[in-house]
Amino acid sequence: MQPADKDLPLMDDIRLLGRILGDVIREQEGPRVYALVEQVRKLSVSFRRDADQEADRALKKLLESLSTGQTVGVIRAFTYFSHLANLAEDRHRIRRRAVHERAGDTQEGSIELALARLRAAGIAPQTIAQTLAGSHVAPVLTAHPTEVQRKSILDAERSIAQLLAERDDIQARARLYDGANDALTPRALAANEALLRARVTQLWQTRLLRYSKLTVADEIENALSYYEATFLREIPEIYAALENALGQHPVHSFLRMGQWIGGDRDGNPNATAQTLQYALGRQAEVALRHYLTEVHYLGGELSLSTRLVQVSAPMQALALRSPDRNEHRQDEPYRLALTGIYARLAATLKALTGGEAARHAVAPQNAYASAQEFLADLRVIEDSLTAHHGAALAAGRLHPLIRAVQVFGFHLATVDLRQSSDKHELVVAELLATARVQERYADLPEAGKRALLIRLLNDARPLRVVGARYSAHAQGELAIFETARALRERFGAEAIRHYIISHTETMSDLLEVLLLHKEVGLMSGTLDDAAARNQLIVVPLFETIADLRNAAPIMREFYALPGVAALVQRSGGEQDIMLGYSDSNKDGGIFTSNWELYRAEIALVQLFDELAASHGIQLRMFHGRGGTVGRGGGPSYQAILAQPPGTVRGQIRLTEQGEVIASKYANPEIGRRNLEILVAATLEATLLQPTKPAPKTFLAAAGQLSQASMAAYRALVYETPGFTEYFFNATPIREIAELNIGSRPAARKASQKIEDLRAIPWGFSWGQCRLTLPGWYGFGAAVAAFVNLQGKTPGAQLALLQRMYRQWPFFRTLLSNMDMVLAKSDLALAGRYSELVSDARLRKKVFAAIEAEWHSTADALSRITGDQQRLAHNSALARSIKHRFAYIDPLHHLQVELVRRWRAGQDDERVQTGIHISINGIAAGLRNTG
């Protein structure tokens, strides 16, 4: 099949959805608006596809002449088209995967291909199962200030995606019949199109924007929709596929879900003990309602009679405990048992959440004390079915339910707690001052803090003074710890396992959190107590370049303290360490950020390998990756395989942020594919990755590139006078901050300093103006400096970089991501944004520097990879970008125009609305944001 042929169904879907959108616009807004949108579309397409300069000039002139009302109408049209094009592309990805599977081809990143590679390497299924038994893979959903999708929009788009899937099914069935005599297919397609038209009309008449600030509760509800749509059903399917592939070897529940929403307090004063309670209450409700539904349907399926089969004694006992006294079911033990199980689940739902089951139980029953107790009842049913040759009956619904309970329990997902180290210090200082243990704790040198904290950790007495009044901050923070302890008792130990310390800079940052754990009873005993345990894993988050360099030294000092290693070992023997991609990039640029992350991982693995001689502590890296390449984004499969040798070992947690969640997990089939990628990459990185470190020449070269890259990046961002002014004017950062798109502020402090700006809106803003600067800046300068290093031959230096690209996954993946970012950038459009900077000298100086480095980086990539065109090895993405640009361009032009009007004082609410819708449309069109 020719490349163009295989994409014909995609083009058909885009044309269909575009035609329906056009019809809806004409119907809803009138023929004039439709004609205007069409005129803009044709001019933009002519310029992008044919390089028609006359069309470009006509387009700019037309867009600048539009009234505010016309502008908003055009922006809405192209924004919705971006959303619909995304749905068509997602459908095509699923379609192409099905084609590969039917042909017996296995896609890169699939579990099938990973297992085939393991078999080819001589690795037995038993070894794979044993590896998985000791593994832990967890995507962690987080809410961020740039998540621009409303749940109402996501729900409507899910409906459209389902209708596109049904349309494929109709056409597939039609191919089995004689088209000339097929009267059914045209009717079915027409009915399908009518439903699509209704959903597109719904989209057009649904607000894209929120008119009130998103709350933490809203973010929790948004996240829960992905469990209902994807995770609860697709994760058990992945396990079933693995068990089928591995034969008789059972697969441990290593793939689990994590969540920050409700427990992430870093920079978010709206996250409190109450939101944490709400998060776990709602999570439990979603899990339990899923189980109730499955148990109900299971009761309908297992109508087996003891007149025909003999059930096991435990099964008979379970049936006898049922409150169901219906005489028609007395010979149907499975139904009786499931009626009782349903009643107990309904009681559990009531006890844990206060909610009522959708279908009333036949009689009140005691709630389950734990998910394990519920699981034990399901196991009784499974064992009995297997004993009388009813295993086939268990495969369809019972096995997925059992796996779901193993994975999701009554808590659904593990909620991480996170707070900044300086906030902990404030609480500790207040406790110590109030107890008259230490005045002005914060002023102590690091050594003094450590000595005091260790002494207090070895003292069984509490610090809180009865009757003393503490600040609202101290009360709020202590309430979080106390609530966490109570919620673990209520929902199970898996409900909350990790306590993350943002901005970990010193060892005292870790000790302060241990002390607070001890104060509220999360840590039992004292540090020198041989029976002491801590309920939570204390997770340092190393974010800046300096902190990444200090990560291993800090952890070495921490574990050298008497009692620490023994405490961790007694508490489960796990140590997660989180690495921040976002702030390290904002601090030092793309190459240095990635290089220092790489070095930190190697150093940490070496440290814990040394500790293994005396204490068996499992190290697990937690990657704080964002959606954009500048924040650690990019394909997960390549990213995991590019980790340093020996750093995965079956253990990985990684954040899924912003629009990435919707693009990866809104569609169940695509969600499953993305989850499979995490599993496949973890298996390959653990069992196939070479254990030898990269050649010393490669490591030395990367160090030199990093030094030069960081110097170039910081020279622009932190050392160029006026750069901050340029950034705040040449990007829509101020307008992004006004959007009601997240529950926490876009900046940690109210200032105009780059240092105080969150890394997420920083990257989001550069994407909106199409410079994508955090994803590439500094690399061109670094390569030029490296190739022309004094005393070295330029040809030999370049040849070394080319060898690194061919042989070193870390270097190849990093350059591949830069290649993608450059392909999505557009200097001409970025130049339009730079015109928003009123200071002409500043504008020219900064933009000229950025433009020169862009060309330098593009040239460096071409020389190293040998590819003169961007995305030479990813033709599907290259085509997608080419088609999309023509529809995103008008949004950029109109955004610049509206931002200019808004900043000039035009206070028409429609101007602000237009800006905000354009932000949404561009984010959807580029398919990555924060």
UniProtKB/Swiss-Prot annotation:
Its cofactor is Mg(2+). The active site is at residues 144, 586. PROSITE patterns: PEPCASE_1, PEPCASE_2. GO terms for cellular component: cytosol. SUPFAM superfamilies: Phosphoenolpyruvate/pyruvate domain. One of its GO terms (molecular function) is phosphoenolpyruvate carboxylase activity. The keyword Lyase applies. The keyword S-adenosyl-L-methionine does not apply. Its EC number is 4.1.1.31. It is an enzyme of class 4 (lyase). GO terms for biological process: carbon fixation; oxaloacetate metabolic process; tricarboxylic acid cycle. Keywords: Carbon dioxide fixation, Lyase, Magnesium. It catalyses: oxaloacetate + phosphate = phosphoenolpyruvate + hydrogencarbonate. Belongs to the PEPCase type 1 family. Forms oxaloacetate, a four-carbon dicarboxylic acid source for the tricarboxylic acid cycle. This is Phosphoenolpyruvate carboxylase. The lineage of its organism: Bacteria, Pseudomonadati, Pseudomonadota, Betaproteobacteria, Burkholderiales.
